[in-house]
Structure formats: C-alpha cells, structure tokens
UniProtKB/Swiss-Prot annotation:
InterPro entries: Pantoate_hydroxy_MeTrfase (IPR003700), Pyrv/PenolPyrv_kinase-like_dom (IPR015813), Pyrv_kinase-like_dom_sf (IPR040442). It is found in: Cytoplasm. This is 3-methyl-2-oxobutanoate hydroxymethyltransferase. GO terms for molecular function: 3-methyl-2-oxobutanoate hydroxymethyltransferase activity; magnesium ion binding. Pfam families: Pantoate_transf (PF02548). 3-methyl-2-oxobutanoate binds at residues 50-51, 89, 118. The keyword Magnesium applies. PANTHER family: 3-METHYL-2-OXOBUTANOATE HYDROXYMETHYLTRANSFERASE. The active site is at residue 187. GO terms for biological process: pantothenate biosynthetic process. Its cofactor is Mg(2+). The gene is panB.
Length: 269
C-alpha cells in the first residue's frame, strides 16, 4: 500500500487494502534505527513484540518481558517512523487478571505510540477483547501457537492438527472477531486451517507458519535476516541469503509477501 505521504497508516487503511486483495507485510521491530529502515523498505506493520525477550535480551522465552520494557521499545520504534502502523504485544501477566487491568496497561502502550495491542489467547479472552475495543483500543487477537502459553502447550509445536483442535481454533477466531478484534494473528497451524479461518473472517489475518492464504505475513526480524541463534524454524526464510544489504533483504521480503511468493510450500505445515 502507498506510504508516499507522511500520514501514518491506520487500521482502516489496512482493512481497505486487505479488501482489495493486497497482502500485508509485517515484521517485528524494537528500535528506532531498524524502524526507519523497515518503513523505507515498505513494511506495512511493525510489531513491537515480546519476542524482544529472546532476540534482544537473550532470554529463553517471552515470559519475563515487562510492560515497562515494552513501553520503552514502543517509544523507540515510534520515534523512528512517520507512516508505518505500529502494533505492540501485551506481555505475559498484563492482561489476564481482568479486563479492567488489561485496559489500564493497554492505555500505557497506546500512549507510548502503539496503534493496536496484541493479546494471546482464544475465546477465554473474548471479554477482554470486547472491553478494550469498546473503549477505543484496537486489538489483534493471537491464536494457534501462543509463546506465552509455552509451558501449558508443552513446547513450540504445531497447533490445530486434530479435528477437535482445528474446530476449537475456528470457534476461537469467530468469537474473537465477534468480540471486536480488528485483526487476528495465527501462529504455527496447518496451512489448510489458516485458509479456512481467513475465509470465515471479515477481519485481516496475519500468519506466521500458518500458510500463504492469510491476509498478511509476519516474521521475527532477526529470523528473516538469519542472525538469530540456533536453527531457523521451518516457516522462516533467510532473506539475507540473496541480498547485499538489510534494506534489500527487507524489500525482498515485502515483495515476496505482496506477490504471494512467501511463504512457499516448504515454509508451511
């Protein structure tokens, strides 16, 4: 979508582009310098993710990331951009106690520069999604593999593989949309299920290991640049392999998402 004007994109901009069949390119971002590079390369949404616990802080999970740390990084990203849409994760423990507490914490993220908050959880979070969305806070719901639930889920594994699990995820998606979610992120689910859910919903879907039929795609920045420690997950493509600069790698990612060339078959489940 056109980012030539200095006006910051809105959820309406993204929804309109989605309705016209344009794919949405999303990357995580945690600082002003990378934010400026990613915006210039044409990324539509910068997700200030609690994944910073892994790739910035060197921790083994996202669970220790605090709200104050998220606010700091949202401010950094906001200062480095002018047009791109900014989404922020609500970290573990900041939205589960009550909708009222979630609202107070979400307000702090929005005041720091976020335009949307992302909440992990299925239909049990519908009340919180509704509470926030009715009070002016756009919400992206997150289902499938949820890193904040890693201990409950028994590790990082594909979700929705059985008929019952797939049905549960479809129900979650519909109930979260009904509750007012403006976007849905689906992580590590079979591609056919990602396509089914995308067709069921009227809101944009963002996939990470959820197939090419989603309205858009997201990757962790460090993964797509090939600089994360350890083996890259199956759903990741290292875009630095064929690029001579970070700017080119990110531009190639955006183009691949927009053209539907990423994810390819080998990146799906």
């Amino acid at each position: 979508m056109d980012q030539s004007a200095a006006k910051r994109m809105t959820i309406t901009t993204l929804q309109n582009a989605c309705e016209q069949g344009e794919k949405i390119a999303v990357l995580t971002c945690y600082d002003a310098t990378f934010a400026a590079v990613l915006e210039e390369a044409g990324v539509d949404i910068l997700l200030v993710g609690d994944s910073l616990g892994n790739v910035v802080q060197g921790k083994s999970s996202t669970l220790p990331v605090t709200l104050d740390e998220m606010i700091y990084h949202v401010r950094c990203v906001e200062r480095g951009t002018h047009r791109v849409f900014i989404m922020a994760d609500m970290p573990f423990g900041t939205f589960q106690v009550s909708p009222q507490e979630a609202f107070g914490n979400a307000v702090r993220l929005m005041a720091a520069g976020a335009q949307m908050v992302k909440i992990e959880g299925g239909q049990h979070m519908a009340e919180t999604v509704e509470f926030l969305s009715c009070r002016g806070i756009p919400v992206c719901a997150h289902i499938g593999l949820m890193p904040q639930f890693v201990h409950q889920l028994g590790g990082y594994r594909v979700q929705g593989k059985t008929p019952n699990d797939a049905r549960q995820l479809r129900e979650d998606a519909l109930l979260l949309q009904e509750a007012g979610a403006a976007m849905l992120l689906m992580e590590l689910i079979p591609a056919v299920l990602g396509e089914e859910i995308t067709r069921l919903l009227s809101i944009p879907t963002i996939g990470i290991g959820a197939g090419a039929a989603c309205s858009g795609q997201v990757l962790v920045l460090h993964d797509m640049l090939g600089i994360s420690s350890g083996t890259l997950p199956r759903f990741v493509r290292n875009f630095m392999m064929d690029a001579d600069s970070i700017q080119t790698a990110v531009s190639n990612y955006v183009e691949a998402v927009k053209l539907g060339a990423f994810p390819a078959y080998e990146h799906t489940f």
